[in-house]
Amino acid sequence: MNRLYTPISTLAVLGLSAGLLTACGDSAPISLPTTPVPGTPAPTPIATPKVRFIAFGDAGRGNENQNAVGAAMAQLCKLKGCDFGIETGDNFYEVGVTSVTDTQWQTAFELPYKDLNIPIYPALGNHDNADTDVGEGANNAKGNFQVDYTTSPGSSGKWKMPARYHAFTAPLSAAATPLIEFFVLDSSPLAATLPNPAETEYNYLTYGPTQLQWFQTALMASKAKWTVAFSHHPYISNGEHGNAGNFDGAGMFPVGTTDGQPWKDLMDESACAMGLDFHIFGHDHDLEWLKPVASCNAKTEFILSGAGSDVRAFGDATLNPAYFQQDLAQGFFWFEVTATSFTGEMHVLKDLKLQVDAAGQPMPMFTRTVTK
């Protein structure tokens, strides 16, 4: 930063203080000019650190809908700026990928987001770990191909999944003081519709506590102004699947992961107990910004971004209190974050196009700002 030196008069240079310069008798001190010398550089304004990112999910179909959302996000990022994106799972329908050279890497990721020249941090979803079209989540080992693609020679370099669950801070520069810390969580082994008993590595009875301990430790150690977890499965949702602990009305099924209770337990003992700021997720194919609930510290806000391709109607639009929600339309969220504010915009596509005003500027369906 350039320092501004205000020049003083020649008298001051000679060592005479303005306070000592007086006329004869008891006259008042002589006032010296403080006008800067022409050509003196103005001080460089201090830039307010900020982070801008998009959130989308349930996208990986390689169809017209996904391509349209990808184009809309690229258009918005060109107009408003984006540092990176986060993807909330179900990155590849219906049964994930089978290798780092699977053709879906091109059809359902590289091509739809070819004009998004930013890193994208995905979470794993139930369809990423499935063997059947219902997305039962019985083959969690499949998700490891998505981890491996991060360093694959065939990758464009946009895909960032160094582990099934991990954390990163933003701004992405290692030298920057973090404004946000993101915790990418692996919810699928804790909410599988039909868990596979042979997958001992991903058994919820051991995988859940291990991930929980990591998350608690990382969240407690965070120095960031804002904390954000993102995952595929919700804690609460007004979409078709509903709230964790009763996914799809699954209370009738045997105790296990079907109802999402192990996932709810993890969130209760970490995000809810420790005051996480935001949870961003997918699984339901709509857009929601839900209010805090008493069961989760009455502080954490919940943002569902699962309209990245094919969409659905709400399951129960009144199940949880919402600031705003939209079903049956493709869309995504854009966020701008500073040390004191967290602003989110819900962008809903119309006729598979980004909605803009007469001047070509984006028109969000809903905007909310949270301050600290």
Task: Pin down the residues of each PLM region.
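Bacterial signal peptide processing site
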Residues: 25-27
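Extended active-site neighborhood of metal-dependent phosphoesterases/phosphodiesterases
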Residues: 93-227, 241-262, 266-267, 275-278, ...
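Structured segments of extracytoplasmic/periplasmic soluble domains
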Residues: 56-62, 72-79, 108, 112-115, ...
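N-terminal active-site segment of His-dependent metallophosphoesterases
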Residues: 32-103
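Bacterial N-terminal signal peptides that target proteins for export
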Residues: 1-12
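A short C-terminal boundary segment appended to hydrolase-like catalytic domains
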Residues: 322-372
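C-terminal motif of bacterial Sec signal peptides marking the signal peptidase cleavage site
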Residues: 20-23
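Active-site glycine-centered loops adjacent to acidic/histidine catalytic or metal-binding residues
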Residues: 58, 89-90, 125-126, 185, ...
